[in-house]
């Protein structure tokens, strides 16, 4: 199950630039792929042009922060799958560690959002993506550790 979750994270992260490339091609079969990825991206993200990265002269299917979340999840999935198995820990220890990891990883993103709301100044897309990478990696790590602990 962990392999499925990790594979899904990597595939979705890879689909984002692939969809931008397919949109730039503007051809038949690639068009369906583009519609699917941008459609799903639109269901989970605001897709604001000014808050999105552009690749191949096309806006990515999700904003910079979401791109960071998914890239972080994919990186964590690859890292998690490549490391040796750790010894089992109790569910309560795992839950406590997960809560702390997620709280600490969410701090940069939360600080960025609070800064944006209180000043009206918008951080750069690179800064938005960086905060997403941290939280995305932590979330993926927690999910994969939880899936791994059930085996």
Predicted regions mapped to residue ranges:
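Hydrophobic alpha-helical transmembrane segments
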Residues: 61-84
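Membrane-interfacial, low-structure loops and terminal tails that flank and connect transmembrane helices
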Residues: 84-96, 151
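Small-polar-interrupted transmembrane alpha-helices in polytopic inner-membrane proteins
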Residues: 8-16, 92-118
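N-terminal signal-anchor transmembrane alpha helix
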Residues: 2-30
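Extracytosolic (periplasmic/ER-lumenal) interhelical loops and adjacent juxtamembrane/interface segments
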Residues: 22-62
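Interfacial helix-loop-helix junctions of multi-pass membrane proteins
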Residues: 47-64, 110-135
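Hydrophobic cores of alpha-helical transmembrane segments in multi-pass inner/ER membrane proteins
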Residues: 70-77, 133-149
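Transmembrane helix-loop junctions and nearby membrane-interface residues
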Residues: 17-24, 113-120, 143-146, 150
């Amino acid at each position: 199950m962990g392999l499925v979750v990790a594979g899904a994270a990597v595939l979705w992260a890879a689909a984002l630039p692939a969809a931008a490339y397919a949109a730039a091609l503007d051809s038949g079969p690639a068009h369906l792929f583009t519609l699917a990825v941008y459609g799903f991206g639109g269901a989970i993200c605001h897709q604001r042009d000014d808050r999105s990265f552009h690749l191949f002269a096309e806006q990515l299917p999700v904003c910079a922060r979401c791109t960071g979340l998914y890239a972080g999840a994919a990186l964590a999935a690859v890292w998690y799958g490549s490391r040796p198995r750790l010894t089992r820990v109790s569910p309560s220890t795992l839950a406590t560690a997960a809560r702390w990891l997620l709280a600490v990883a969410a701090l940069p993103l939360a600080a960025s959002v609070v800064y944006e709301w209180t000043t009206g100044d918008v951080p750069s897309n690179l800064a938005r993506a960086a905060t997403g990478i941290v939280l995305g990696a932590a979330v993926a790590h927690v999910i994969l550790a939880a899936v791994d602990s059930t085996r």
